[in-house]
Curated annotation (Swiss-Prot):
UniProt xrefs under InterPro entries: Usb1
Record-level GO BP terms: U6 snRNA 3'-end processing
A Pfam family the protein falls into: HVSL
Gene Ontology CC: nucleus
A molecular function GO annotation: 3'-5'-RNA exonuclease activity
Subcellular location: Nucleus
Protein name per Swiss-Prot or TrEMBL: U6 snRNA phosphodiesterase 1
Residues where UMP binds: Y279, R287, F288, H289, V290, T291
EC number: 4.6.1.-
Residues bound to AMP: 182-184, 279, 281-291
Highest taxon in the source lineage: Eukaryota
Amino acid sequence: MKRPLVDYDSGSGSESECGSSSDGPKSSSTNIPPQLKKRRNGDIGTRAPPSAPASTPIAPLGRSSGTHTIPPKPAPKSTSSLPPISDRFNDLYASNTRTAVSDDPSLHQGRQRQVPHIPGNWPSHVYIDWDPSSGDRELLSSLVDKLQTRVAAAAQRYPDLEGVKISTALRDPELPVDKPLHISLSAPLTLTSKNKDAFLDDVTRALRSSGVSPFVVDFSGGVNWYRSEESTRSFLVLRVREVQNTGMTTADSSPNPRLTTLLQRCNKTAKEYGQPPLYDSQDMGYRFHVTIAWTHARPSESLKQLTDSIFDDCKTMYSENMSIRDKLCTGSSFRVETVKVKIGNHVTRFELPDKGLALPVKTT
């Protein structure tokens, strides 16, 4: 029988674990090579032999008393709950600004640039994000789904609905992600490499000096189709209204005073850089909105009537007696705390200074 290089002391209690038998050769210091004596007498830890279970008490090598228990490995952490995605991830999908050099509408659901791309220019946008809650997103998605279904079903009876396709603004068409919606504070802008940094500094300074603190908006302004003269698309929008500190929406002759102030500051800065203003008219306070769907077709009377009938449907997921219109007007709102400036793919966040109660701001 071959003699093992190392034989454990009989008092160590480890013979069975090491596979030695009772009739095998006894351990003797004279039988151990010098290089192994040094290892045996040294402090080399308490590693268990490879065949030992993880929780088996193992005696330290070269010692006849005391045990050391190797604790079992901790159970792997559950991966069922994922960490929340940072809202900065949404900055990649918050704006419709595109930065590709070539314009191929077939790759973007037929959408075309309002401003043709010129190498060296930076498409830009100033806006306020709204990332709907799961309940609001489900409600709006159900509205768009119903509208798509009813338009397709009614196309045979109403010629002005033939070929009309409704596209949602709630999800990115190219990636399986929910998109945050937005309130625009500028028209589509085109900045140059030379002036983009100066524009960012100036528009940030203008927003900071506006005196506007965080405020709350809801969608009591109603729902309707909107198409601008320069656009090739029609948009289904939720009209935004600011909520006063009392919880009531503004109902005076100057709706949305805070949004109007922010827009005026952005428009002034845009004009200084030769860029077009947004809503540069007397009724700008009524025109703030969030887009939830769009179509290439012009909004016909049939499309408007179908949209109204869906919004007035009294069978929502919330109540048999509450229409979608009522739910949006009374239950959906969000707090505006940040304005974002997107230049190319870079998004800068400007936090509105919180000065306590956000009182109405006088417009100029």
